[in-house]
């Protein structure tokens, strides 16, 4: 994790390394509210049980792609179910979620991919041109693209990449989530968009 190399003076202390994680929230919700609606997008509906299952399959699918603990998985997605699932599914395989602002230019996207060392990127079909242009500018190969079609917004799959649904279908619903050992394990990696002044 090259982006952590600049952090100093953050030694583990009793107050800062206990195992606290938001991953347990969804597991609890799936047990307490199994049939309650958790996600709504267009005609898509998912209960908390289904939401948990989809996150588990995402974690398993990513693990099958070789994503391991500490690897970065980027997303360029609007507010759709795949983004909500990424918030749990990516950390559930031990990886670090890197949500990238969809309004960024190709140079900034390339910088974030490179600096964050993204191994995989979940990309909405509408953002493929920006991501492909960003990867073309990179000296490294860039992340593996998993395409997230959005039929509700009239963005069908391009046919050039493995789709998000195919990744979920490849996942194991019995995959054991990899919970953080302590608070020092990264869950997310965020970059400013330059809008904070």
Where are these regions (language model features)?
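Conserved AMP-binding A3 loop
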Residues: 47-49, 187-197
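Flexible, non-catalytic linker and terminal segments flanking ANL/adenylate-forming cores
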Residues: 1-19
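Conserved G/P- and acidic residue-centered "switch" motifs that form tight phosphate/ATP-binding loops
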Residues: 73, 94, 195
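Conserved pre-ATP/AMP-binding loop-to-beta segment of ANL
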Residues: 34, 147, 160-162, 169-191
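A short N-terminal helical cap/helix-turn-helix that marks the beginning
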Residues: 16-38
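Structural core segment of the AMP-binding/adenylate-forming
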Residues: 64-65, 92-169
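Conserved AMP-binding/adenylate-forming core of the ANL superfamily
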Residues: 35-80, 84-88, 105-110, 160, ...
């Amino acid at each position: 994790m090259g982006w952590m190399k600049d952090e100093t003076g953050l030694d583990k202390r009793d107050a800062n390394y206990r195992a606290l994680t938001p991953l347990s929230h969804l597991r609890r919700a799936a047990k307490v509210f199994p049939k309650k609606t958790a996600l709504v997008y267009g005609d898509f509906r998912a209960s908390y049980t289904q939401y948990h299952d989809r996150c588990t399959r995402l974690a398993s699918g990513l693990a099958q792609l070789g994503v391991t603990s500490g690897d970065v998985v980027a997303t360029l997605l609007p507010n759709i179910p795949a983004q909500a699932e990424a918030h749990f599914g990516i950390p559930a395989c031990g990886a670090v979620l890197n949500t990238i602002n969809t309004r960024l230019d190709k140079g900034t996207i390339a910088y974030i991919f490179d600096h964050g060392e993204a191994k995989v990127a979940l990309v909405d079909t509408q953002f493929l041109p920006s991501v492909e242009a960003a990867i073309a500018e990179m000296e490294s190969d860039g992340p593996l693209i998993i395409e997230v079609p959005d039929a509700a917004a009239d963005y069908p799959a391009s046919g050039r990449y493995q789709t998000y649904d195919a990744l979920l279908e490849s996942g194991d619903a019995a995959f054991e989530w990899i919970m953080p050992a302590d608070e020092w394990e990264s869950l997310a990696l965020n970059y400013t968009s330059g809008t904070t002044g």
